[in-house]
Amino acid sequence: MAELSEEALLSVLPTIRVPKAGDRVHKDECAFSFDTPESEGGLYICMNTFLGFGKQYVERHFNKTGPRVYLHLRRTRRPKEEDPTTGTGDPPRKKPTRLAIGVEGGFDLSEEKFELDEDVKIVILPDYLEIARDGLGGLPDIVRDRVTSAVEALLSADSASRKQEVQAWDGEVRQVSKHAFSLKQLDNPARIPPCGWECSKCDMRENLWLNLTDGSILCGRRYFDGSGGNNHAVEHYRETGYPLAVKLGTITPDGADVYSYDEDDMVLDPSLAEHLSHFGIDMLKMQKTDKTMTELEIDMNQRIGEWELIQESGVPLKPLFGPGYTGIRNLGNSCYLNSVVLVLFSIPDFQRKYVDKLEKIFQNAPTDPTQDFSTQVAKLGHGLLSGEYSKPVPESGDGERVPEQKEVQDGIAPRMFKALIGKGHPEFSTNRQQDAQEFFLHLINMVERNCRSSENPNEVFRFLVEEKIKCLATEKVKYTQRVDYIMQLPVPMDAALNKEELLEYEEKKRQAEEEKMALPELVRAQVPFSSCLEAYGAPEQVDDFWSTALQAKSVAVKTTRFASFPDYLVIQIKKFTFGLDWVPKKLDVSIEMPEELDISQLRGTGLQPGEEELPDIAPPLVTPDEPKGSLGFYGNEDEDSFCSPHFSSPTSPMLDESVIIQLVEMGFPMDACRKAVYYTGNSGAEAAMNWVMSHMDDPDFANPLILPGSSGPGSTSAAADPPPEDCVTTIVSMGFSRDQALKALRATNNSLERAVDWIFSHIDDLDAEAAMDISEGRSAADSISESVPVGPKVRDGPGKYQLFAFISHMGTSTMCGHYVCHIKKEGRWVIYNDQKVCASEKPPKDLGYIYFYQRVAS
């Protein structure tokens, strides 16, 4: 490289910017690859746009955008010097005292076992003229000051990825409870002693909670590992509705742990001293005798590395490196994302769409490629498949690796992808653990949005479901079809092969808990796969079915079949369910999944000879056998004007209020719960719950229910104002018809952003309507643009499959635990556990959560 002259630097001085508070500085990762400052070529940060690029891509940015001056960062690792007081190479590590990241007393993510030597240069393209950071002294003051301030600001600025990951996350920041100033306490309570407490329903003497309404002392929740309490405090809340409780043993003059069951979170109670004095407790005289919830959670986070389930940790595994064997770093509860994308990029259709067309995608990328979906997915696919990042962890300065690092690779850290895919989503934008199945569907939805008029790899998963409903009173039937991407397989626990052992285990467990003894060895339910398949295809009774043949309620049976078989069949084992108390729980079950699978018997047949269809008549808004004005709807009983405040029709449907209340108590929005009950035809809590789970990601999930033919709430002004032509043009340019654009805008009060979300969440209905318009004689030009397919495109073929991948989950809930995946490559099973990629010796195929089957060529 040539030395940078004063004249060259003066020529680019006007383009050098100093980053401000709102600027995103991408100095950790290349926008097009996973190169970092630690990569061989270092990282070039544009001093105008603050985007980072590896050596391979920096000229692409220069040629496309024009800025010539870049800050070149190159870092090399060296081991930390040995601390003489510890006798090891590691300095004394501070024990975290707060459940926080990036704040005093919290977890320090910057702590490493090595130090970094940093080389900083200013480089001007295209000739790569350079000058070292400390070589600016001989330049004129105006030049030196401008460049130095920009360099120092870039180096000191928080990187975009750091802001995304950390955001000074503090798990101890609590909100004031909404009950704090209005809590009603019962009169004449018992006086609570300052010590010697015991649960009033069992003999537990720790993890005790004092209810601030009635003074009851009860034990806390049971933790995932069997420790903790017996759930008596939360059960008391469900029985009484008394919302606030304080953890005994944590009360000090400075405060205490207060939990709100109603708000489902740790909270602040500014009136705590007053509330405690009601029971004779003087906060000023209390001392801490038990661990706070923060301390317990920190201990749990520090022990999480000890988990060995499903990871084949008891067996020596051979590490694998090279193309297709790239690990992914865990960015903090991101293992759900890692597992899903690893499987997707093992499928040829996703490879062809994004990796094979990498250059074309990058060439068409916008000025800021970090915000482009196709660019970031292509970058992710290339990072996984190229082998460039599938290398052992670099050796330390003495040429050795610690033993536990021998099977670990650097892998890739998909920070930009995670930030983009989760942008605007209430869950996936956080660092909390998520459900891999929900993320799979979210990613499928994002791919769908970005492949509207081009090759769509989602077609490998898409299939049609045929649902047949038969009215038992008239024997008449109704067939419907819908698009799906996942086969959700129920787990009939009553079909377990080891029922006696399970009953014996439960009895031993109960006795051990009563006697405070060690729990017996776990006995897991063994359910045959054939029983799960039978349960999926079994007829399901539908009570209170509105029969259009009878024009009255009847009983019906519903059967579910496949109208088409996809190239890749995704099966979710429904391990996560709800107990009788509506508390989420995970079924601890073993299902021996077959390597070869034939579901040909589940193919739908459509309307059969001799079957008579139910009349296609819409049910009445208020069925004759239901009282008007009930279930929370408003109106004068002497008039026929009964309507919900959310509905515009004066004769709104009667919904099962008990089911709505159950769903609302679980934390779902009221309007979403009303829609769930409405769209499942008042067919019960389970059906409504399934609807909620299937539609949680819909953009209009929490919007009020708008009945067919009604304008919906707040639509008066929109109806009066025609949709703006520029909004219509924008939607049409995305490949939709003018009719579809107008319909979407009218349904969303002419909001362009909401209209786009609405049109994607109703795409199947719109395509079906367009197809119907064509069949009724309208021209294709009048009904739908040529670029929009008529109906969902599905592939079909034989129903014979072979297992090629599965995702496993460890933990008691989708909101915690860990995910790993196993993928069959080159005839052998491979386990992907974050940065560890190894040949699998005993793949736990019976303990998976999501299974991926590939069609067998006939």
Curated annotation (Swiss-Prot):
Residues 74-96 are annotated as: Disordered. Its main location: cytoplasm. There is a cross-link at K113 (Glycyl lysine isopeptide (Lys-Gly) (interchain with G-Cter in SUMO)). It catalyses: Thiol-dependent hydrolysis of ester, thioester, amide, peptide and isopeptide bonds formed by the C-terminal Gly of ubiquitin (a 76-residue protein attached to proteins as an intracellular targeting signal). Disulfide bonds join C195-C816. SMART domains: UBA, ZnF_UBP. A zinc finger (UBP-type) spans 175-283. The modification Phosphoserine is found at S149, S156, S779, S783, S785. Gene3D superfamilies: Cysteine proteinases, DNA helicase RuvA subunit, C-terminal domain, Zinc/RING finger domain, C3HC4 (zinc finger). Substrate binds at W209, R221, R222, Y223, F224, Y259, Y261, D264. InterPro entries: Papain-like_cys_pep_sf (IPR038765), Peptidase_C19_UCH (IPR001394), Ub_carboxyl-term_hydrolase (IPR050185), UBA (IPR015940), UBA-like_sf (IPR009060), Ubiquitinyl_hydrolase (IPR016652), UBP13_Znf-UBP_var (IPR041432), UBP5_UBA1 (IPR041812). GO terms for biological process: protein deubiquitination; proteolysis. The active site is at C335 (nucleophile), H818 (proton acceptor). The modification N-acetylalanine is found at A2. Keywords: Acetylation, Cytoplasm, Disulfide bond, Hydrolase, Isopeptide bond, Metal-binding, Nucleus, Phosphoprotein, Protease, Repeat, Thiol protease, Ubl conjugation, Ubl conjugation pathway, Zinc, Zinc-finger. It is found in: Cytoplasm; Cytoplasm, Stress granule; Nucleus. Its EC number is 3.4.19.12. It comes from the Eukaryota. GO terms for molecular function: cysteine-type deubiquitinase activity; zinc ion binding. Residues 654-695, 722-762 form the UBA domain. Pfam families: UBA_7 (PF22562), UCH (PF00443), zf-UBP (PF02148), zf-UBP_var (PF17807). This is Ubiquitin carboxyl-terminal hydrolase 5. The gene is UBP5.
